[in-house]
Amino acid sequence: MNKKISFIINGRVEIFPESDDLVQSINFGDNSVHLPVLNDSQVKNIIDYNENNELQLHNIINFLYTVGQRWKNEEYSRRRTYIRDLKRYMGYSEEMAKLEANWISMILCSKGGLYDLVKNELGSRHIMDEWLPQDESYIRAFPKGKSVHLLTGNVPLSGVLSILRAILTKNQCIIKTSSTDPFTANALALSFIDVDPHHPVTRSLSVVYWQHQGDISLAKEIMQHADVVVAWGGEDAINWAVKHAPPDIDVMKFGPKKSFCIIDNPVDLVSAATGAAHDVCFYDQQACFSTQNIYYMGSHYEEFKLALIEKLNLYAHILPNTKKDFDEKAAYSLVQKECLFAGLKVEVDVHQRWMVIESNAGVELNQPLGRCVYLHHVDNIEQILPYVRKNKTQTISVFPWEAALKYRDLLALKGAERIVEAGMNNIFRVGGAHDGMRPLQRLVTYISHERPSHYTAKDVAVEIEQTRFLEEDKFLVFVP
């Protein structure tokens, strides 16, 4: 099966080229996706786009809500096509693909959550729309301008989130899709066009693709005109973004991270196992927040292990795995054999839907992902802390939730960036941080308009007449 995906330039779908010389292909097993080769005209149109988005925030959020209502409709053609593409090309199960589409609708339709996102990260939901008085100044946040998003394919929703952040801050979005997921950003942009092809939000979007090998001169030209770059992916992708971005702009890096789960002597073993299994299974451990290790403290360890296996089997039915190709199956088998040879205890599903490897803390051979988890029985939190690493550890899920209150300071000081209840690793709560930052703050420029000299300050209750102060040598008179 072959699929053609056209570029979208400034909210308009480009005509797919007829010549094979102007087309590039991405293979997905027996299937292929064909995309245009980026050309000078497209790059020029992207760079020349200079329409200021003067919409109020409520206009933007209402538009996103309207788009989200379409995604909520299970008969919406874009949604149906998107689900089919995730299954056919990316190997998603029906349940996984449907859940991805459901989350897109949830995010777009959560008007309150979008308002709160802006308020929490920028300080006020009005700060993008008007000048706000703050002490002795007025302040307003303006968009950086051209935001270039280098997306990854392991977590489709990360691309949606990246785009929405730029839209909420009124930036132009130049989206470079991933070779492993050329579908999500394209489907989202097409749904904007369906609602209103002339809407400023629609017109601010461009969705393209380029390879990092070969001639990247046009890609470099786009990068050199960026006002901010949002880079997702592995070390190579992050390094490429840093290398080709202008030296004076901000590169927001969402690079590779690891996450794990702490189970602290639970009373409810079933709930503990359910939460841990969810955090292992969601996205088949492809996400930075996915649990790859479980540290169990307390008694009833064997009972917990059996409950965990039971819940991994449950998730194999309610959220079936992505299809493994030949190499992935071989890697799974190899890790199993390596661990057995090393004397570790291994439980593995006959269909490779999950694997549990028991080892001491710090003993970890290879990690094939795909719902493979290392289970460590430890005595106390001190045996876990060495495996929390700054800039490397993202999410630590904890059960019971109350146990996190005991450990959160220790975990944070060691470098943990996010602490959640087990079973909640995929839901980024409003008000929280992402990889140690507030991303919206880095997508805007804060401009201050400061009050005039006759405005008296709290500590200096006279007009600020600096020339007179110098002439009369009275500066120290006004020092509080």
Swiss-Prot record:
Pathway assigned in UniProt: Lipid metabolism; fatty acid reduction for biolumincescence
GO MF annotations, alphabetized: acyl-CoA dehydrogenase activity; long-chain-fatty-acyl-CoA reductase activity
One biological process term in Gene Ontology: bioluminescence
Top EC category: oxidoreductase
A family per Pfam: LuxC
Catalytic reaction(s) noted: a long-chain fatty aldehyde + NADP(+) + CoA = a long-chain fatty acyl-CoA + NADPH + H(+)
Keyword Cytoplasm included in the entry's annotation: no
EC number(s) recorded for this UniProt protein: 1.2.1.50
Keywords assigned by UniProt, alphabetized: Luminescence, NADP, Oxidoreductase
InterPro entries: Ald_DH/histidinol_DH (IPR016161), Ald_DH_C (IPR016163), Ald_DH_N (IPR016162), CoA_reduct_LuxC (IPR008670)
Family note: Belongs to the LuxC family.
Its biological purpose: LuxC is the fatty acid reductase enzyme responsible for synthesis of the aldehyde substrate for the luminescent reaction catalyzed by luciferase.
Name of this chain's protein: Long-chain acyl-protein thioester reductase
Organism field: Photorhabdus luminescens
Lineage: Bacteria, Pseudomonadati, Pseudomonadota, Gammaproteobacteria, Enterobacterales
